[in-house]
Amino acid sequence: GYPNRIKHDCRAIEKFALLFSLRWGSDPFRTDMISNEAGLCWIGFFRGWGSDTQRAKKVAVDLEECSPEGRILDIDIIVCGKSISRSDLGLPARSCILCGRTAKECAREMSHAYSDLRAAVKKLIQNI
């Protein structure tokens, strides 16, 4: 099953949405917040990405990496239905919040107990 929401997750999302807007240099012209069994998702629609998708992804990765709390984020930049990846920019893959290996590798191998991952995420959210 899906994980349950974590207390204060909305506050964390709102903080990083604001930080993204500030670093991008403009506010989104439309936003939405989706909450379901899988968790919480903030969607922001910004103008001007078509011409500067690499900069948008670099802003996103910087937020994901700039603080321990940012490690819980997964910011996707999608333009015309195409997701811009870290590898598209020659950036390293996201690291695991528990051991530092690549997150995809740990997920694929199920290297960590769900309870350990959830506890780490909870701790990071509580620091926001």
Put a short name on every predicted segment.
Residues 1-28:
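General detector of N-terminal leader/presequence modules that precede the first folded domain
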Residues 1-3, 48-52, 102-105:
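A generic structural motif
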Residues 8-16, 55, 113, 117:
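Short amphipathic alpha-helical segments
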Residues 16-24, 63-67, 125:
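Hydrophobic, Leu/Ile/Phe/Ala-enriched alpha-helical segments that form helix-helix packing faces
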Residues 32-85, 123:
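A broadly conserved sequence feature marking short terminus-proximal activation segments
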Residues 68-128:
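Cys/His-clustered metal-coordination modules, chiefly Zn-binding fingers
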